[in-house]
């Protein structure tokens, strides 16, 4: 027990720190109102109600964007239930928010202990990793999947380290377990980025094994890790496989539309190049690693909120300063900077000089790699190469987030440097190491000092192009120059204030090291001093972006989905399946909110991975039709019988039965029933085959969907090549039963015909007519269509992909392998203890 006492103390310290940061909100039960979390609740409400009602999970919901799989909404599979039990134990059953910071610290602590670093130094490492500013920006934004995935990455790498340190079985189990946990956390982008880090690590261990002539050991460890990776991946194979299949149909997949001109230079598969690089870190903005407000801070903070800036403000312009953001970097918008700690940066740079071995070069290389790729459109040569040639890279947006690699490698090398210093009291007195100290001081404290006294040295302008354009339009010509000069002075003051702060933090940290080298401080006091300094530094910066004022009573979460009078009126319609289109805040809000989806089946919605074809319909038809509809309904005073239905044929074919319009200035809403919606399904007179996606989407401008179905020739076989349908007053089809993943219709027709359903086409849907399977075709770019034989029939349509059952079997087998590994480890440890006794 005594052996593990330092570890228990470290874990207890992590718990205390986590509770302390969120005090008093954690004690009072207050919560953060997070946009992405709230959006997830809205999008998942239909699935949640179905689970509560039936005890089964639905893999499809009609709540947003007309309908889509739930693979990236609620990626829960029965095979991961036991894994979630393990996760709860690992998290020590701690409450929300508190547990996030705790697991972030614990994971890095496990990694450092795997390296053989003392519990006290590993505890410091856990703190400086976990308190990097980016993580505290993720929490209020609601990017919890990303946060948790990042928290499980250090212990995953700990397994890699253990395996290469000849603890094969333990390393393999740890690697497999945490790969499984991080993939379950469902942010593949972060896992993907850290595959590069692992490659850097493997390269370092290969070099070390080669020099020591231990290549057999290297290959043995690599084999164990490869098996562990397979097990970890297979435990999550259901999630991974269906995410992969789904991604091909989303905005991350290949568009079938042929682009012309500049658009043709975008990626042929994956996200568009501009979309991938829209959030690119500025080259000068990289200095936020050292000085947090080097680009002003976050977009959500105005100039008037900065004391340093307002001390320089011309009172004449105070009204403008209350509207201008402090941030003036290259990104369109940011919640805050990536800051890893001033003294941590000093230790990292010092580590580049005093730490020996290939792992140092791996960490330095990974850091540079991360920074260069984070520049995105500001360094397009490298970015283009990765988009075009590196598998999967073009599937992810916001390249600035690859800086998480630097946030990992910088504190890791910093701890290695501090370990060297504390274990060798005289090392900094050596001439070559003195040069390293001087270089580290120049590159950190020196840069901070220059930023403090002359910010213009690094930046040519403190005003963005967009701001300058707006100011030229808003200000009289005679005020433009003095305003720009004053704004520049204010932003220089913001930078200088934080730069002085970083400078003195580095000086104080160096003073601790200097006193230790002079034998004036013991190693324990030096470590405690550095830990306190780093904690105060990073804690205070994080409080700028996540503080107690942001927490609200739990009741606020439910208030986000309070049923409005418009909702009440619409919900009186007991028809089982129709759609609602919310015009409030159009165009920006319609496709950026899920409040509508909480109560209704929405044409709009918010999700990072919507179906690509639906997005293309939004761009080509839905948004233009919304503009026409808004104007037409407003002109008609809400009297729909005076509105030309040909202006919104696509909305009608989506069975958009209700529009929600703004009424008055107090946020009120009024529902308007659309009598022209086509209903759940209809017979058509004609099938028009087209040769490609461009012809298909363009044809919708010319046809009347109730009469003609536009079908790609690729689906001609599914409709048996028919070109003429049959439709008269005797041909009817009616939805009789609705579940999100199962629809039942009754149809009657005197002749064979073709039916189009106002449901979104997606591979995996199955249809039977009177129990006999039939093929589904895609019609009108996004809808489903089938051949209907003459007579009276029951049509059943359901979504239960066979692939789920196959992948679940694989996942259970992988779980069994992991359990066998754990049992084998326990047996070997017991045998070792028995031998010692």
Model regions and ranges:
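Conserved luminal/periplasmic juxtamembrane motif of membrane-embedded glycan-processing enzymes
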Residues: 2-746, 752-756, 760
């Amino acid at each position: 027990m005594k052996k593990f006492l330092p570890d228990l103390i470290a874990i207890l310290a992590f718990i205390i720190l986590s509770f302390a940061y969120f005090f008093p909100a954690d004690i009072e039960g207050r919560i953060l109102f997070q946009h992405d979390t709230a959006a997830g609740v809205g999008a998942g409400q239909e699935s949640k109600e179905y689970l509560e009602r039936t005890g089964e999970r639905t893999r499809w919901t009609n709540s947003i964007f007309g309908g889509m799989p739930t693979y990236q909404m609620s990626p829960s599979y029965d095979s991961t239930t036991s894994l979630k039990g393990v996760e709860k134990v690992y998290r020590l059953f701690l409450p929300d928010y508190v547990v996030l910071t705790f697991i972030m610290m614990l994971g890095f602590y496990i990694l450092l202990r795997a390296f053989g670093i003392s519990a006290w130094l590993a505890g410091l490492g856990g703190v400086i990793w976990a308190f990097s500013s980016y993580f505290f920006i993720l929490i209020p934004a609601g990017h919890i999947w990303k946060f948790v995935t990042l928290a499980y990455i250090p212990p995953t790498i700990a397994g890699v380290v253990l395996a290469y340190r000849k603890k094969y079985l333990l390393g393999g189990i740890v690697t497999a377990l945490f790969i499984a946990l991080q993939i379950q956390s469902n942010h593949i982008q972060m896992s993907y980025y850290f595959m590069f880090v692992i490659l850097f690590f493997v390269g370092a261990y290969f070099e070390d094994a080669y020099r020591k002539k231990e290549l057999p050991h290297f290959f043995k460890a690599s084999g164990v890790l490869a098996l562990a990776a397979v097990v970890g991946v297979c435990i999550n194979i259901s999630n991974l496989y269906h995410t992969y299949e789904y991604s091909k149909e989303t905005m991350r997949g290949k568009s079938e539309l042929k682009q012309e001109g500049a658009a043709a230079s975008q990626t042929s598969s994956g996200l568009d190049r501009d979309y991938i690089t829209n959030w690119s870190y500025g080259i000068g903005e990289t200095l936020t690693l050292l000085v947090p407000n080097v680009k002003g801070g976050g977009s959500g903070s105005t100039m008037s909120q900065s004391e340093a800036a307002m001390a320089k403000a011309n009172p004449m312009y105070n009204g403008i300063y209350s509207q201008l953001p402090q941030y003036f970097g290259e990104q369109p918008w940011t919640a805050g900077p990536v800051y890893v700690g001033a003294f941590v940066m000093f230790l990292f740079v010092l580590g580049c000089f005093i730490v020996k071995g290939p792992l140092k070069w791996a960490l330095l290389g990974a850091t540079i790699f991360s920074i260069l790729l984070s520049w995105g459109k500001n360094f397009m040569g490298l970015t283009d190469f990765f988009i075009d040639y590196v598998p999967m890279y073009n599937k992810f947006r916001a390249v600035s987030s690859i800086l998480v690699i630097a946030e990992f490698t910088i504190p890791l090398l910093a701890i290695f440097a501090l370990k060297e210093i504390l274990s060798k009291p005289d090392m900094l007195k050596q001439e070559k190491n003195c040069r390293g100290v001087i270089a580290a001081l120049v590159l950190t404290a020196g840069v901070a000092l220059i930023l403090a006294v002359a910010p213009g040295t690094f930046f040519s302008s403190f005003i963005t192009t967009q701001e300058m354009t707006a100011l030229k339009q808003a200000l009289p010509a005679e005020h433009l120059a003095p305003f720009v000069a004053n704004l520049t002075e204010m932003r220089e003051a913001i930078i200088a204030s934080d730069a002085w702060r970083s400078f003195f933090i580095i000086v104080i940290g160096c003073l601790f090291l200097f006193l230790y080298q002079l034998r004036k401080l013991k190693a324990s006091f030096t470590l405690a001093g550095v830990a306190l300094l780093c904690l105060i530094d990073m804690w205070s910066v994080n409080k700028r972006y996540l503080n107690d004022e942001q927490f609200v009573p739990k009741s606020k979460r439910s208030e986000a989905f309070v049923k409005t009078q418009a909702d009440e009126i619409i919900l009186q319609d007991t028809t089982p399946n129709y759609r609602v289109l919310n015009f409030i805040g159009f165009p920006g809000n319609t496709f950026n909110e899920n409040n509508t989806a909480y109560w209704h089946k929405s044409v709009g919605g918010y999700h990072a991975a919507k179906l690509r074809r639906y997005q293309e319909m939004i761009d080509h038809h839905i948004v233009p039709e919304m503009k026409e509809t808004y104007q037409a309904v407003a002109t008609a005073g809400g009297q729909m019988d005076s509105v030309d239905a040909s202006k919104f044929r696509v909305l009608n074919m989506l069975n958009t039965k209700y529009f929600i319009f703004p009424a008055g200035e107090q946020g009120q809403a009024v529902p308007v029933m659309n009598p022209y919606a086509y209903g759940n399904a209809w017979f058509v007179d004609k099938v028009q085959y087209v040769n490609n996606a461009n012809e298909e989407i363009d044809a919708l401008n010319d046809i009347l969907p109730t009469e003609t179905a536009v079908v790609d020739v690729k689906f001609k076989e599914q409709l048996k090549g028919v070109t003429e349908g049959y439709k008269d007053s005797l041909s009817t089809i009616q939805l009789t039963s609705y579940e999100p993943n199962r629809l039942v219709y009754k149809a009657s027709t005197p002749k064979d015909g073709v039916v189009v359903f106002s449901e979104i086409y997606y591979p995996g849907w199955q249809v039977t007519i009177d129990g006999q399977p039939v093929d589904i075709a895609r019609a009108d770019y996004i809808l489903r269509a089938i051949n209907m034989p003459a007579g009276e029939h029951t049509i059943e349509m359901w979504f239960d992909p066979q692939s789920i059952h196959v992948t679940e079997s694989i996942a259970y087998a992988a779980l069994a392998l992991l359990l066998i590994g754990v049992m084998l480890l326990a047996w070997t440890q017991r045998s070792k203890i028995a031998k010692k006794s």
